[in-house]
């Protein structure tokens, strides 16, 4: 990956080692650098289980908070695992989707020229809506983003904890397709060792069933590998989707 990824981390990031996680959204780390090590609390916006990533002594990279008045001055961006970085910031998929759209790096969104964040769809809001010029004949394209940090036997898998909210999103996407519009799931695999993608039926069998039901109904599934480094996050290749059991 180049030193100029689609999402570049701001200046002033710190690195160190993981100590513990408290109350889902707070992580204690010990900083590394020229000075004496210091223990600091940082914010984690990842409410998932982060299976396999919360290991004492594991590397951590955190970015400075945009708001200097925030109680926790840092946000965890990366966790180290077996010599690689794993992206754990759950805002990254949304940001990368928008950046890739404007950079023309989403072949599946070719012809779309307008991008709206947090677009209202009925009684819900979805992460993005893309629109094309009226004379293009292309229907609106609705996109929901998911962050993927779990890999088992080379298969990147989502979710890492049971998610009724995620199930709801798949049902909403199927309804959009029934209305004649496009609906897509953007799964960002923020680690290098996932070579294909599938729903984690061993974590949430309901979600896994809905995933394949949605795919069969016409919901488009786009699992992209992210290119993750200490410089930032870039968009990598599409990964193949594991077929449903028995196929």
Swiss-Prot record:
Pfam family membership, one: SfsA
MF GO annotations: DNA binding
InterPro entries for the chain: SfsA (IPR005224), SfsA_C (IPR040452), SfsA_N (IPR041465)
Family: Belongs to the SfsA family.
Alphabetical list of NCBIfam families matching this protein: sfsA
Protein name: Sugar fermentation stimulation protein homolog
Record organism: Oleidesulfovibrio alaskensis (strain ATCC BAA-1058 / DSM 17464 / G20) (Desulfovibrio alaskensis)
Lineage, opening ranks: Bacteria, Pseudomonadati, Thermodesulfobacteriota, Desulfovibrionia, Desulfovibrionales
Gene: sfsA
């Amino acid at each position: 990956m180049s030193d100029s990824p689609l999402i570049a981390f701001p200046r002033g990031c710190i690195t160190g080692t993981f100590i513990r996680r408290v109350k889902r959204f707070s992580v204690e780390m010990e900083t590394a650098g020229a000075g004496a090590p210091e223990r600091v609390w940082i914010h984690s916006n990842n409410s998932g289980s982060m299976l396999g990533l919360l290991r004492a002594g594991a590397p951590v990279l955190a970015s400075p908070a945009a708001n200097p008045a925030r109680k926790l001055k840092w946000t965890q961006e990366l966790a180290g695992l077996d010599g690689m970085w794993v992206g754990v910031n759950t805002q990254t998929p949304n940001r990368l989707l928008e950046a890739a759209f404007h950079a023309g790096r989403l072949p599946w969104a070719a012809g779309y020229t307008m991008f709206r964040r947090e677009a209202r769809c009925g009684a819900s809001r979805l992460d993005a809506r893309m629109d094309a010029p009226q004379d293009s004949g292309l229907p609106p394209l609705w996109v929901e983003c998911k962050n993927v940090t779990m890999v088992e036997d080379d298969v990147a898998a989502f979710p890492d904890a049971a998610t009724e909210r995620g199930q709801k999103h798949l049902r909403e996407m199927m309804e959009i397709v029934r209305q004649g519009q496009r609906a897509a799931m953007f799964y960002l695999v923020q680690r290098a060792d996932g070579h294909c993608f599938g729903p984690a039926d061993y974590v949430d069998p309901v979600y896994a069933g809905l995933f394949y039901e949605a795919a069969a109904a016409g919901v488009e599934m786009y699992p992209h590998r992210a290119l993750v480094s200490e410089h930032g996050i870039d968009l990598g290749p599409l990964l193949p989707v594991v077929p449903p059991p028995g196929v």
